[in-house]
Amino acid sequence: MFLHSTESGWIAETPAKINLFFEVLGKRNDHFHEIVSVALPIRFFDTISFERTDEPLIQFQCIGGGEDVPMDETNLVVRAAKLIQQRFNVHHGASITLTKRIPSQAGLGGGSSDAAAALRLACRTWNLDVPDADLLPIAAELGSDCPIFFHDTPTISAGRGEQIQPLPATPPLWFVLLKPPEGLSTADVYAECMPLHDGQYRQPVTLLAALSNGDVQTIGEHLFNRLEVPAQKLWHRFGKLKNQLLQAGCLAVQMSGSGTAFFGLCRDEFHAGEILDRLTMQYPQSSFSLLEKFCSLSPHF
């Protein structure tokens, strides 16, 4: 995420992520699922602004995002700000504006990314010197994948997602991202995920090696998402949308997280632009709520 100060407060650009690898190892005693995930942040952002107020109230407004974005205290951004208030005995408030671009029910982590940024923004707005190490457990309370957004590089996660190891920065990777209007319930997708036997689990070893040196072909050959199987059972258009990206020329296509966004891996920016133009000409704009090309969040770009 990118944070900078303004005359009246702080602003953050909060990135989306895609899951290059997602394995479900089973259900835990706490009803969460044990997972292994490799997530890659991409240059596709929501924007959040915080302004300090004297009264200890959290004022929140959201621009964009549609009906799926909570506008009340259940929004993760508001919950994050209130947690900082409570944990650090803050007597000031904040006026918060969230500008949503990352769609909901997409598997792109927009809400979690916003929540992670809100924790950092609240600390800066209220002049709290809180290291990220102390914010990470709070982030995990808000959502299993919130902690990954404290890193601007790929991450590998385990446990229910809270055990995170940052990976080295990658060369730029280009994708075409497609999000249909419909969404899937994460709970429903996990409920349809059948338990596996020992030895059936996939490991991201080859993918991680390819990711470190930007070997696009090998990355494409080793993309994996266990949640595609239950998603396909619940959603009749799954195969059709995936094939649209493949037929347009993507090297490989995968659903991100629990869906319903798909990303198509491309050789480079020019290739991504060609595929985007092809899809734009073939299908009416109303077919998708999002169709765009994006690059990974990389210091090399």
Spans of features found by a protein language model:
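Glycine/serine-rich anion-binding loops at beta->alpha junctions
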Residues: 97-126, 144, 250-266
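Contiguous, small/hydrophobic- and glycine-enriched helical/loop subdomains that border
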Residues: 93, 115, 119-156
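ATP-binding N-lobe of GHMP and related small-molecule kinases
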Residues: 1-106, 124, 128-133, 170, ...
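Short, basic/glycine-rich phosphate-binding loops at helix/coil junctions
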Residues: 56-65, 70, 118, 140, ...
